[in-house]
Amino acid sequence: MFSRDLTIAKYDAELFEAMQQEALRQEEHIELIASENYTSPAVMEAQGSVLTNKYAEGYPGKRYYGGCEYVDVVEQLAIDRAKELFGADYANVQPHAGSQANAAVYLALLSAGDTILGMSLAHGGHLTHGASVSSSGKLYNAIQYGIDGNGLIDYDEVERLAVEHKPKMIVAGFSAYSQVLDFARFRAIADKVGAYLFVDMAHVAGLVAAGVYPNPVPFADVVTTTTHKTLRGPRGGLILARANADIEKKLNSAVFPGAQGGPLEHVIAAKAICFKEALQPEFKAYQQQVVKNAQAMASVFIERGFDVVSGGTQNHLFLLSLIKQEISGKDADAALGKAFITVNKNSVPNDPRSPFVTSGLRFGTPAVTTRGFKEAECKELAGWICDILADLNNEAVIDAVREKVKAICKKLPVYGN
């Protein structure tokens, strides 16, 4: 029998110390990685609940194990809330991650060797959209589209490639593109060549839920997302679709038993909480602020003479090219890290450096907005970053910025009392 008094602190001091240090890092450092955010205590409570004990292969009302009557309630709540949130007729809340949701979509609708048309990783796409190092690029014939000289998707080029290669599926989505996707145009191109349209909205799902970014569900045959990032929930995946009995059946079979075994019901419970939070009026205000903050930061970099890819942002992220400054993303990342500002190095279009070094940085504002930053704080923060980028080896500037970061983080904590 387990005692409820047996805590990690009492049982595993070494592990607890690492966890405490990570908690301190999150409070004292400014988080600008576009794919990161802070979950609510309720989301974390669900992930640490007794639901982690329950195996539940199958779907609500149709399980391969007994004793699933209560996890059925949990999972159905998540399904119903996801459908309401995104205006979908179908939702599968079982994918363990966004990449696994994407893999399930391919498994459901494609055969090995089929042609897919997705955005190049080097131009802002995602590994799972056909990159050669990913299973999506190994199992399928992946054709890639990119951005033009203005940093925008060239839809005429997408259409030309679609007509030339006749893909079975067109993938719309990104990991580093700061503008709004034209889902209607993607739909028209897909219809022209008889392709499925698959939208991966992992980065902008929270914006979509709040109505501050176009909803792809009415246009796509299938939509996937992660449940963290802008959606601010647990790390996990989600598949959505309009009513189509054939596609729904294929998607369910592809997730289980095709790609996964038992679902993680404790994570699904956390997803249910996340969806409920996203249905509240204050979530829309939060997402509106996320975009305002990203635009405020981008404007400062442009004013200071830096190149923002595509000239600005209409969502939660933007890419900063450092080619003109002859600075590597790796070195810039390290210097900012010393000032307690967490970013990620990122390849930029026509990047002369390797993906392990890069010539750019990716910035995102979901996490800083969660802790209360508004435009004024974000502009000030962007100015501090510019000061460091002006001379990566100026330790005095780095030290001064670090003290400012610690002060503003203390003023605007992630988790209050």
From Swiss-Prot:
Catalytic EC class: transferase
Names of the cofactor(s): pyridoxal 5'-phosphate
Annotated pathway: One-carbon metabolism; tetrahydrofolate interconversion; Amino-acid biosynthesis; glycine biosynthesis; glycine from L-serine: step 1/1
Binding site for (6S)-5,6,7,8-tetrahydrofolate: 121, 125-127, 354-356
Marked site: Plays an important role in substrate specificity: 228
Gene Ontology MF terms in the entry: glycine hydroxymethyltransferase activity; pyridoxal phosphate binding
Origin: domain of life: Bacteria
Catalyzed reactions per annotation: (6R)-5,10-methylene-5,6,7,8-tetrahydrofolate + glycine + H2O = (6S)-5,6,7,8-tetrahydrofolate + L-serine
UniProt keyword terms in alphabetical order: Amino-acid biosynthesis, Cytoplasm, One-carbon metabolism, Pyridoxal phosphate, Transferase
GO CC, alphabetical: cytosol
One of the GO BP terms on file: tetrahydrofolate interconversion
Subunit structure comment from the entry: Homodimer.
NCBIfam families, sorted: PRK00011.1 (NF000586)
Protein family membership: Belongs to the SHMT family.
Protein's name according to its UniProt entry: Serine hydroxymethyltransferase 2
Species: Pseudomonas putida (strain ATCC 47054 / DSM 6125 / CFBP 8728 / NCIMB 11950 / KT2440)
Lineage: Bacteria, Pseudomonadati, Pseudomonadota, Gammaproteobacteria, Pseudomonadales
